[in-house]
Amino acid sequence: MNEDTEQLDIISDFRTFEKSSYDKWNTLYQNIKEDRKFIAGDQNDKVDKKLIGDNVTECRLNVVSNAIRTIVNTYLPNQYKWQYENQQDLTTRADEFLADIDNSTAAVEALQNAIGTGLGVLVFSNDLDIDGNVKSCLYSINDVTNVRLDPVATKLNFADAKRAAIIELKPKEWVEETYGVGSFMEKPLIDIQDNYDHKQYMPLVTYYLKRNNQVYVFRMLGAEIVEQITLPYSYIPVVP
């Protein structure tokens, strides 16, 4: 299989996956969008607003946000730990990893999403520390509706997932400046089911694919794969 054919195979695989994932999780994602507005304080419908009147300043206690904050505060003194039986060295390293301020913050952010809207997503990745050294890190996806989860995974932590994707809508000017990919396409080959402004944006897709017990990640844009990395994992590092 030549490189062009292989790229088209990966892109086709993503398109099939993205549609099936969107179809399965779309109802949840639409509910999450409504819940987020409610949590943010948009809690009055048209009838409520008409009864309140235009000249009345709304002043109310956001019970939902306070309840979420209370549950999170209850969790903080009892944070999740990894423990390995008869492997104290691994347990110590896991404690150090989760105690890192960035990683612990990510865990709390995912918890807030899970409590508030029913879904939080964590991603294992790598980053550079202040000395320029590569370190493992954990980060939370702020807008979980931009995540595509494996629709056929059966385990609670999605440990058996074969695919996942993270979608970022990027301005077309940024696309051209950063990747040199032509932004003239009205309908890019690498696209998503969700609605967005095709004239202004293009989806930048980070696609995780597990084949033969090896995990690959592809950065895709427009009609091409702009980056490909083989990950040192045996699992998809996108964890709901």
Please place each PLM-identified region on the residue numbering:
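Extended, helix-rich architectural segments
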Residues: M1-P203, K210-V215
